[in-house]
Amino acid sequence: PALAQDSVATTAATAPSAAAATAPAEPFQQTIAIACRFTWECVENEPCTETEFTPDITGNAGGASADALTVQSQMVSDAETVDMTGTKQVKALSLTGGGFDARHLLSIAADGASRYTVHYADGPIVISYLGTCK
């Protein structure tokens, strides 16, 4: 028991400060700057209609491997700005964000084909957009 107490005291006395305990920067860093153009809007089970929805995605990605990065970003449109997080694998990207009232999901394939959906709790209702992001 005395040894355990000494160990705890030593650990507490030598614990690094909060500033010193921050994680080192990831070896692979990347700036995210993507322009999307969605040309179809689908509301619930109604027929899809043509649209012109052009949000921009900006942010940063980092990770231990260039092939799998964690992403923190914002999607900015005329309607709103949504904080989104997710992963980037090679050229494909998957992001989620929003709050309980409106959950957002953006999927971008390696070739740029993209789907963006918003799920609203009130209703509930879902709106989907089809287009490209590059």
Where are these regions (language model features)?
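Beta-strand secondary-structure signal
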Residues: 33-37, 117, 130
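Edge beta-strand at a domain terminus
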Residues: 51-54, 121-134
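Amphipathic/hydrophobic helical signal segments and adjacent flexible N-terminal regions
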Residues: 2-33, 41-44
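Short, exposed beta-strand-loop hairpins at the edges of beta-sheets
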Residues: 105-109, 115-128
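Short hydrophobic/aromatic-rich beta-strand segments that constitute the beta-sheet cores
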Residues: 38, 66-67, 71, 114-118
